[in-house]
Amino acid sequence: MPEPGNRFGRKERRERHSGRVDLADTEDWIRAYVEPVGPIRAEHERPWATVLRVPIAGGVTWFKACGRVQGFEPRLTAQLFARHPDFVAEVLAHHEQRAWLLLADAGTPIGILGNPPETWLALLPGYAELQREEAAQVGDHLAHGVPDLRVATLPSRYDELLQRELPLEPEEIDRLRAFAPRFAELCDELDAYDVPETVQHDDLHMSNVYAQGEQLRVLDWGDSSISHPFASLVVTFRFLEEVTELQPDDPWFERLRDAYLEPWGRGLEGVFALAMRVGIFAHAIAWLRQRDHLPPKDRAEFDSVFSIVLRRAIAQTTSPPR
């Protein structure tokens, strides 16, 4: 959809950095596309984004203002919706410079439905098809700010991770340091396979998949990167274990893996296992990028969860892949 011109100057830069918005200015922009029938209210406010609920006749729309760390999300979402309108939330408007996004309502998050594996079985083949088609757009996505976490970049990113102050015990950091040469070998091994790197959602869980009748849509692309596609299921499988309480050896994991891999071709089970192992570390590296954009006052709360992500990676320094 066409965007208004970029007329906003210093205030725009401040808002985009923080994800906060001036409500009056925001309402003017929203009203150019929809007619609210009640108060526009904040649904949530985070350092990286603010989401507003916009009531309209017959339903609701959603406004999102992204901070700088996720500033690529509105354009990426609009591009994905243009090419995959049945799989991504309908984009009513976006403003690339202000990092603003206006979405139609997409239904109910599947977490409210219990995060059933049957829903993932229906979703994952379509998600794989989206990734396959988006591989042709990698250059464009990178040029417009989607983070580059391609496999060849990961060893150097791993080294950068080790140079940072991490919310871990010294012996845990030592384990990560000792694993660095092996991690580089795993990346080389994974990079040798002929699987195209593409958009990887990296937050593909029950709160970001919505159901509206039989229609399933993926939302919240702000954690995406260009990376190995198979690593998308790192987060999906984690939530199926932790929330749905599937055991690691539950047959559902193989069923979901096979459903996801079917569009990619045969004989990729070993590549998938390797990508999942490497992907756990890539996910931790991506979290570091988010952390770097937080104000100091918000880092302690963030680190309480970041430490869990890091420890899941540490477990892979000795554990074989699934």
Q: What is each model feature region?
A:
Residues 6-40:
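Juxta-kinase regulatory segment immediately upstream of eukaryotic protein kinase catalytic domains
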Residues 7, 18, 247-248, 265-267, ...:
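ATP/Mg2+ or Mg2+-diphosphate-binding catalytic cores
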Residues 41-57, 62-63, 91, 184-233:
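Active-site acidic catalytic loop and adjacent metal/ATP-binding pocket
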Residues 43-44, 48-148:
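ATP-binding pocket architecture of kinase catalytic cores
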Residues 102-116, 132-136, 159-167, 277-299:
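A glycine-centered beta->alpha junction motif in the catalytic cores
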Residues 114-175, 195-197, 225-226, 300-304:
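A cross-family kinase active-site recognition segment
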Residues 144-149, 265-278:
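All-alpha amphipathic helical-bundle segments outside canonical DNA-binding/catalytic cores
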Residues 216, 229-265, 277-296:
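Active-site activation/catalytic loop segments of kinase-like enzymes and analogous catalytic loops
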